[in-house]
Amino acid sequence: MADMHSLFIAFVLGVVEGLTEFLPVSSTGHMIIVGEWLGFTGDKAKTFEVIIQLGSILAVVVMFWRRLFGLIGIHFGGKPVEHEGKTTGHLKLGHILLAMIPAVVLGLLFHDVIKSLFAPKNVMYALVVGGFLLLAAEWLKPKKPSAEGLDDITYRQAFMIGCFQCLALWPGFSRSGSTIAGGMLVGVNRYAAAEFSFILAVPMMIGASGLDLYKSLHFLTMGDLPMFAVGFATAFVVALIAIKTFLTLIKRISFVPFAIYRFIVAGVVYMVFM
């Protein structure tokens, strides 16, 4: 049976996961850092992180459920999803599948290598490099995006965003950061790039989390269920709030503050763990 200390750890990590999963600051990096501070490491901690990520994924499903079902041809009320963009295009399942291919291929080929990178030093470097990518996206993006809305995104842009997503295989880089920045660099409006990133996260994270969970099921016990339930529920609620807030925020501010934050966190990692 989980004690109060375990439930407290679950709550704290649930908050961290929910807050950072869809912000361009790296949830994995923060989970590793906070986990080290709380003394919650090892195989059980990794399994716990996988499960609470599913809570964050559920938040995206709740936020974008009409769009997600629309991708597979299911339209509730007989009406298609409201068109977002200036062209006559539509976001289709093919866009998502194309964006998934690069990271899926590399992830399967180098799964064990990627898992070996989960250490504070590697996270520190990823935070810095990812910060520079955010700055590059703001400074080098086209003055007038070719894709103003989600439905304007082309197959080529979707695939290129998928290539940028491969950077997120480096722990600490940030999946949302790499895909949103990549989207901006290939001509997608910041807001539309964020929406595409969140929708792309659903199949990507379910696949990655499902594989990790399958490989670590033997670390679970019935006594861990309360702890995992608290972490899952907390991550879901916090992620829901974080996504809504983030989508509102990026209409008004650039990613420069997020880049600066990443540099600060990298400095903290250096001082504490190096």
UniProtKB/Swiss-Prot annotation:
Single GO BP term: peptidoglycan biosynthetic process
Coiled-coil spans in chain: none
Membrane topology: Multi-pass membrane protein
Origin: domain of life: Bacteria
Annotated EC: 3.6.1.27
UniProt entry keywords in alphabetical sequence: Antibiotic resistance, Cell inner membrane, Cell membrane, Cell shape, Cell wall biogenesis/degradation, Hydrolase, Membrane, Peptidoglycan synthesis, Transmembrane, Transmembrane helix
Subcellular location: Cell inner membrane
Regions that span the bilayer: 6-26, 45-65, 94-114, 117-137, 155-174, 191-211, 223-243, 253-273
An MF annotation (GO) of this entry: undecaprenyl-diphosphatase activity
Primary enzyme class: hydrolase
Keyword Transmembrane helix: yes
Cell membrane listed as a keyword: yes
Catalyses which reaction(s): di-trans,octa-cis-undecaprenyl diphosphate + H2O = di-trans,octa-cis-undecaprenyl phosphate + phosphate + H(+)
InterPro entries the UniProt entry points to: UppP
Cross-referenced Pfam families: BacA
GO cellular component: plasma membrane
Additional notes on this entry: Bacitracin is thought to be involved in the inhibition of peptidoglycan synthesis by sequestering undecaprenyl diphosphate, thereby reducing the pool of lipid carrier available.
Family indicated by similarity: Belongs to the UppP family.
Function: Catalyzes the dephosphorylation of undecaprenyl diphosphate (UPP). Confers resistance to bacitracin.
Record protein name field: Undecaprenyl-diphosphatase
